């Protein structure tokens, strides 16, 4: 995987930085694991915008990714690595000995032809999925479940990982990249290693149009709006907004804590590092 800066042959190419990978499959994705992906333009069933800055973009199919890794005791071979437009990480197509194929998040260092497996008896090897109870303390993991059997919810994006730092009783303690230390049920599964495509953070799209291809619409500043549209709007001439930065609904937007989940507070051993 290489990071390439394009030559400034035009204004749109001048600032482009691309991540080029020779190991990614160049053909069509596997048809048996594709689903239709319809666009909402950020609107709900009333036609009102509920998610801003969403709309347009290239047509895509959704790749059905196996986040549960529950096909135990059957070895699988990595058939190919693929680009996935729906996420920052690449995906790997596994072919099991019984003929079934599944997509998984591609771990860093996993190559075509590698053998992977999942389950309690799986080897301690990069790319294998095991319950946290069976993973050695100190290991780097990704694609971690929060509820047994629900599927991975933590550390799924490009370059993401967490570290298993302790295990006591029915719970394992995991240190996340944010610095948060959290207890997770030891029966929850995780995949050894870290997510691949860590160079994703180095890319630069280079022009506004590349953002539009990805379905992202422009963000208008509040101070450029009218008072009816935003708390920062209006005023004679250019203003600074006249108050601490807030969202269009008046909620403080820089550094204001918004977490409201008391149910799981007891599972957080240490909060994430203050930014």
UniProtKB/Swiss-Prot annotation:
Functional summary from the UniProt entry: One of the primary rRNA binding proteins. Required for association of the 30S and 50S subunits to form the 70S ribosome, for tRNA binding and peptide bond formation. It has been suggested to have peptidyltransferase activity; this is somewhat controversial. Makes several contacts with the 16S rRNA in the 70S ribosome.
Family membership: Belongs to the universal ribosomal protein uL2 family.
Keywords: Ribonucleoprotein, Ribosomal protein, RNA-binding, rRNA-binding
Protein name stated in the entry: Large ribosomal subunit protein uL2
GO BP annotation list: cytoplasmic translation
Region annotation Disordered: where it falls in the sequence: 28-58, 223-275
SMART domains assigned: Ribosomal_L2 (SM01383), Ribosomal_L2_C (SM01382)
Name of the gene this protein is made from: rplB
MF terms (GO), sorted A to Z: rRNA binding; structural constituent of ribosome; transferase activity
Subunit structure: Part of the 50S ribosomal subunit. Forms a bridge to the 30S subunit in the 70S ribosome.
């Amino acid at each position: 995987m290489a990071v390439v800066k394009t030559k400034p042959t035009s204004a749109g190419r001048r600032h482009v930085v691309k991540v080029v990978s020779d190991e990614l499959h160049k053909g069509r994705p596997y048809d048996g694991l594709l689903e239709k992906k319809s666009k909402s333009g950020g609107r709900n069933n009333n036609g009102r915008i509920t998610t801003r800055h969403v709309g347009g973009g290239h047509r895509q199919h959704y790749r059905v990714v196996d986040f549960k890794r529950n096909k135990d005791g059957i070895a699988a071979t990595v058939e190919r690595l693929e680009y996935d437009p729906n996420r920052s990480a690449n995906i790997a197509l596994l072919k099991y000995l019984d003929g079934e194929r599944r997509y998984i998040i591609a771990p860093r260092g996993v190559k075509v032809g590698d053998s992977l497996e999942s389950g309690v008896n799986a080897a301690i090897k990069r790319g294998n999925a095991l319950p946290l109870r069976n993973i050695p303390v100190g290991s780097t993991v990704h694609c971690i479940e929060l509820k047994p059997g629900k599927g991975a919810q933590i550390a799924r994006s490009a370059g993401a990982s967490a570290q298993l730092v302790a295990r006591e009783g029915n719970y394992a303690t995991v240190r996340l990249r944010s610095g948060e230390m959290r207890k997770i049920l030891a029966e929850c599964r995780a995949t050894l290693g870290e997510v691949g495509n860590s160079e994703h953070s180095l890319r630069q799209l280079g022009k506004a149009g590349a953002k539009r291809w990805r379905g992202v619409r422009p963000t208008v500043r509040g101070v450029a709006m009218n008072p009816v549209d935003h708390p920062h709007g209006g005023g004679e001439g250019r203003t600074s907004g006249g108050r601490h930065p807030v969202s269009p609904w008046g909620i403080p937007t820089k550094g204001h804590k918004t977490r409201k989940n008391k149910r799981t507070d007891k599972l957080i051993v240490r909060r994430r590092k203050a930014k």
